[in-house]
Amino acid sequence: MTEKNINCEIEKKSLRKKMREAHASLDPIAKAFESAGLCMRFIQSETYKSSRAIFGFMPLKDEVDVLPILRAAIVDGKKVLLPKIVYEIKSNCKAEIFEGEKNSTGEIEGGKMDFYFVKRDPIEETEEGAHGIFEPKSSCEKADIENFFMEMRGEKIVVLVPGLAFTKEGFRLGRGGGYYDRFLERLSGICEAGENANNSKTKPKFVGVCYAAQILENVPRETHDIKMDIVLSTHN
């Protein structure tokens, strides 16, 4: 890691702390109204109406409650997918993949997000997993992302992306785990590898979702950070 990258990581860590502290001071009732307004605005947008599939997330307490979007998408017959974190650990020099909480026999080396189809109310189809995040139950069907994008070629797909902060231009500050960075990079690679990679209709639209207080002029970023196509916020 270069000195420039080290400095960027230090800046990100400091800003994450500030954003968490700032969010803790926000009024819960005001947040609920803002969440509801954002969801209604998105559901009425052409981006939502023209989409055939939505990659969503189960919100943490400091994230916009996107459940109304997910429920509307299910009712409207769209494909809805939610993530489950899969950790990779190194134990006795042997890599192992497991789901759930950190394994005490080794340290987490990295991880990824797998996505699962949700066909009913997300509250019914999820359960609390690692870090208090609600994830799809084992009864949900796991998506083969590569095949899914092959089958959906030519259709419009939306990926809702949470974050601690965004810029109006679409740059994002995540929580530091890198799960969305890796997933978005993976999706970008899948689309670039496809025979219709130059057709914008085959590429998913990355939509950052946040409160107005989470919009900043700048966030520390590195070359691998992927820009959002849209930032959904009452700020814009």
Where are the predicted features?
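Short, charged low-complexity linear motifs
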Residues: 38-40, 158, 162-166
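N-terminal active-site beta-alpha-beta segment that forms phosphate/nucleotide-binding
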Residues: 2-151, 155
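Surface-exposed, charge/polar-rich loops and edge strands
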Residues: 2-10, 14, 21-24, 128, ...
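A residue-level signal for conserved active-site and pocket-lining positions in enzyme catalytic cores
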Residues: 19, 56, 80, 160, ...
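N-terminal hydrophobic or amphipathic segments with adjacent small-residue motifs
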Residues: 50, 164, 168-172
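Glycine-rich nucleotide phosphate-binding loop and flanking beta-alpha elements
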Residues: 62, 88, 166-167, 179-181, ...
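Short Gly/Thr/Asp-enriched flexible loops that form oxyanion-binding sites at enzyme active sites
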Residues: 65-71, 170-185
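Short secondary-structure boundary segments
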Residues: 58, 84-85, 163-164, 211-213, ...
